[in-house]
């Protein structure tokens, strides 16, 4: 059975199968969205990998990266949020819902998944949870 829980631990220290974070399209390329709380060295590593893979950050694009130094998760799933900046903290709930669903559809069979998308308020958090649930069942 699928369940959702909240934690105050930083995403990098969660011993999960997959960690989901967001990416955005910027005028300069692809960047990570806020909400991931990853250490700077991990951000630099992920940015380099995303550039090598020619990730765009477009809405619902999903890229899986394994063996991210400093991250306990087995893999990091980066899901696109569309146009934005690395400092933008709010996204439409439909975008968050869709991004979470797209990411979760790619991790079928994984027992534990942590989602660290930008959720500045309870409505955004609810949208991410709804999308994650939908992604598990599609």
Predicted features along the sequence, with ranges:
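Glycine-/small-residue-enriched capping loops at alpha/beta junctions
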Residues: 1-138
């Amino acid at each position: 059975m699928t369940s959702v829980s909240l934690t105050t631990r930083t995403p990098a220290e969660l011993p999960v199968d997959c960690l989901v974070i967001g990416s955005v399209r910027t005028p300069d390329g692809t960047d990570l969205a806020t909400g991931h709380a990853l250490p700077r060295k991990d951000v630099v590593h992920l940015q380099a990998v995303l550039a090598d893979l020619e990730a765009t950050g477009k809405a619902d694009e999903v890229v899986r990266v394994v063996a991210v130094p400093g991250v306990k998760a087995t893999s990091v799933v980066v899901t696109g949020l569309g146009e934005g900046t690395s400092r933008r903290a709010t996204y439409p709930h439909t975008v968050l819902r869709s991004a979470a669903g797209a990411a979760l559809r790619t991790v079928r069979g994984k027992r534990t998944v942590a989602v660290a998308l930008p959720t500045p308020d309870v409505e955004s958090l609810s949208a991410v949870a709804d999308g994650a649930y939908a992604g598990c069942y599609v």
